[in-house]
Amino acid sequence: MSHIQIPPGLTELLQGYTVEVLRQQPPDLVEFAVEYFTRLREARAPASVLPAATPRQSLGHPPPEPGPDRVADAKGDSESEEDEDLEVPVPSRFNRRVSVCAETYNPDEEEEDTDPRVIHPKTDEQRCRLQEACKDILLFKNLDQEQLSQVLDAMFERIVKADEHVIDQGDDGDNFYVIERGTYDILVTKDNQTRSVGQYDNRGSFGELALMYNTPRAATIVATSEGSLWGLDRVTFRRIIVKNNAKKRKMFESFIESVPLLKSLEVSERMKIVDVIGEKIYKDGERIITQGEKADSFYIIESGEVSILIRSRTKSNKDGGNQEVEIARCHKGQYFGELALVTNKPRAASAYAVGDVKCLVMDVQAFERLLGPCMDIMKRNISHYEEQLVKMFGSSVDLGNLGQ
């Protein structure tokens, strides 16, 4: 085996995925892998110019579309080996639907949303079941409350019987499906031979990649028991989810470029940071970071206002402790919490939400693992770092002592 060479970029690719798994602890590793590598692929080229990926592509290129639209989403140990053998699917032996996704879609071109809303009425009981089925769907995680409500309104229930085909290999994508209950086989036809490459068991989702990239269904999904699915039509899926993902990427990239400490990053480094940034919402008065605690993240304010306070050594509160004194206010586009990452000391101040606040959060462990030691990157702008120290705390202040 000594003649086998590791392809360039493979180690970094797998390290990045491994770090995200350890950080987020997803319940479904395969579903998480599909989401992670889909985002990675989207970041490399606009959706409108992405080629139809073939599973023969190397890891040095945009990853393939795995699965029934996501064969890799299935549970079981066999799919990873079998997926490597998959080639562009041959047309299904079943009748093809009329083409519904031949046109190119570019979310950047649709600035105004004038399409009528799709609403499928539901009983309270149906709504509750739908919310429960969707709570762990990764594609819905970044939607705000209004967007999620629109998605839930547009979803429709589909009851399936055993042996019913939900989607057929080679067909055009028309709906995205979330599984509420039931078991389903994932079948792939190659060289006129059909084989099972995985199963779904009362959870999961499938069908999104054909809608996102205008590619035919890569597998057939057959119900092996009676079950229930929730479908989302292609138009709503692309209007809300695809467009939202594109906007989120642009917004995150824009925020990163606006942070002085990160302006010197290469484009490739910024793209990696986009992948490790999360989003958190804080209510009025909620404490975001605490003075004296170990630093593990830094924050960029997406919306709202944040108050920065330190404990006074000369003023006491009513409980006899050191009173907190406000030293700064941060607003949209500004950031806080990065100094502790550079000094590797406890938090020098506390931060509180003033009104409702939405922050982009970068985890220092993922940051360091993906891009190298945090200090190496921050040193590129060390003069700005020193300027921030003087501005916020005074040149003679020891940050380590402030955290005690």
UniProtKB/Swiss-Prot annotation:
**Record's subcellular location:** Cytoplasm; Cell membrane
Judging by the UniProt lineage, the source's domain of life is: Eukaryota
Q: Name one GO biological process term.
A: intracellular signal transduction
Q: Which parts of the sequence bind 3',5'-cyclic AMP 2? A: 261-404
Describe, from its UniProt entry, the tissues in which this protein is expressed.
Four types of regulatory chains are found: I-alpha, I-beta, II-alpha, and II-beta. Their expression varies among tissues and is in some cases constitutive and in others inducible.
* Record PTM Phosphoserine, positions in chain: 48, 58, 78, 80, 99, 350, 395
* Predominant location: cytoplasm
Q: Where is this region: Disordered?
A: 47-90
KW Phosphoprotein (keyword) present = yes
Known post-translational modifications? Phosphorylated by the activated catalytic chain.
Where are the membrane-spanning stretches? none
Q: What does this protein do?
A: Regulatory subunit of the cAMP-dependent protein kinases involved in cAMP signaling in cells. Type II regulatory chains mediate membrane association by binding to anchoring proteins, including the MAP2 kinase.
Q: How does it assemble?
A: The inactive form of the enzyme is composed of two regulatory chains and two catalytic chains. Activation by cAMP produces two active catalytic monomers and a regulatory dimer that binds four cAMP molecules. Interacts with AKAP4 and CBFA2T3. Interacts with the phosphorylated form of PJA2. Interacts with MYRIP. This interaction may link PKA to components of the exocytosis machinery, thus facilitating exocytosis, including insulin release. Forms a complex composed of PRKAR2A, GSK3B and GSKIP through GSKIP interaction; facilitates PKA-induced phosphorylation and regulates GSK3B activity.
| Name this polypeptide is given | cAMP-dependent protein kinase type II-alpha regulatory subunit
**Which organism is the protein's source?**
Homo sapiens
